[in-house]
Amino acid sequence: MASSLSTKPFLSGSRRRSTTDGSGWSYFQTSDLRQLSNQSVQISVRRQTAPLKLVVQASGSSFGKVFQVTTYGESHGGGVGCVIDGCPPRFPISEADIQSDLDRRRPGQSRITTPRKETDTCKIYSGVADGFTTGSPIHISVPNTDQRGNDYSEMAKAYRPSHADATYDFKYGVRSVQGGGRSSARETIGRVAAGALAKKILKAYAGTEVLAYVSQAHKVVLPEGLVDHETLSLEQIESNIVRCPDSEYAEKMIAAIDAVRVKGDSVGGVVTCIMRNVPRGLGSPVFDKLEAELAKACMSLPATKGFEFGSGFSGTFLTGSEHNDEFYTDENGRIRTRTNRSGGIQGGISNGEIINMRIAFKPTSTIGKKQNTVTREREEIELIARGRHDPCVVPRAVPMVEAMVALVLLDQLMLQHAQGNLFSINPALQEPLSETVSSAAASLQGV
């Protein structure tokens, strides 16, 4: 009995190498396929009656290998949020734990942030039962309540200079005009929500702390060494609206932001982030170095333009003998480094010292000053952008940076323990993968 093969056309057929069309490719036609038929194989071709529709789907909304986070929503849609997959079960979490970081990120919190009024109240819809994670996907959602779509009527046709308006059109041929869609900083709500959970797990398991603060606003730069990273606290960072732990420089930064805010302009700045009590051994050699993972995570945030780790670019002015972190043994017999120009990571792997890095944020691109631009029809015009926007993004970027760093660290920690258990198991239902249970994990046995 002869076999039968049916084919479905894809863009007029299958590709084969040729030079007849000048591009190096041509296509099998239906007659070519019929010529392949013989007594044992019969090929029938069904013609496409309706025109093909090419659907473009945006990717890149998911992050992480084990602790995976997918964000969703747009600035002027019904809401924003995230779905977290891979969270360890039986860990205590509440909406209040997440809300505290969302409050640090939300708009309208001070005169130097966007005046948009959103409470950003989160709700957990799945993955948590009786206050504990279940191991299934966790869905966290935040509604949008203060949209003003009419503010973006001019941007429907004109591109904001240095904004994603133009590149979204270049890539997709269509975009969400109101609020910039996915390019809006409201997308980061999902990241901050997931990061709040990640920070709590890191703290419970290893005592790991992630703290970020503003170290530069426009031309006001916090001097190196003025902040003690060994003792820095969240209370110091949150003591003022710009989130600079030094009160004197905080006032200077606020004044610099105010000066451009009243003119409808904007400025950029730098966020410094430190990680204390990071377990040794996180990260991998070559492509998955810990600093590479951190750089990718932080550079995925809106408005980021630079990343510096450890000694950063200033290290290029030193010799090897000046830059090397010499080892010693401390009073507890633990191998440490006397200096930390490596920034807590060597060879792509954490060494147990404080990890430190800096992220540069550009000035907000949507400003209330007249600028030259073009329309979608390529007409050159002048644009004064309306809407409510931050005169400087760095005060609200602080919890965003902390979130992305925490997501990387937890994902790397779980990868490190991929062949064991992150937390103590339920002995009534599970068998241990290892006879050794860390003291930190054992402390959560009652969870």
UniProtKB/Swiss-Prot annotation:
What the entry lists under CDD domains is as follows: Chorismate_synthase
GO CC terms, sorted: chloroplast; cytosol
The cellular location(s) given in this protein's UniProt record come to: Plastid, Chloroplast
User: What happens to this protein after translation, modification-wise?
Assistant: The N-terminus is blocked.
Highest rank taxon of the organism: Eukaryota
Q: Where is this region: Disordered?
A: 1-24
* Pathway assigned in UniProt: Metabolic intermediate biosynthesis; chorismate biosynthesis; chorismate from D-erythrose 4-phosphate and phosphoenolpyruvate: step 7/7
Keyword check for Plastid: yes
Question: Mind listing the GO molecular function terms for this protein?
Answer: chorismate synthase activity; FMN binding
UniProt catalytic activity: 5-O-(1-carboxyvinyl)-3-phosphoshikimate = chorismate + phosphate
Q: What is its EC number?
A: 4.2.3.5
Q: Which family does it belong to?
A: Belongs to the chorismate synthase family.
Summarize the subunit comment: Homotetramer.
What is this protein's function per UniProt?
Catalyzes the last common step of the biosynthesis of aromatic amino acids, produced via the shikimic acid pathway.
What is this protein called in UniProt?
Answer: Chorismate synthase, chloroplastic
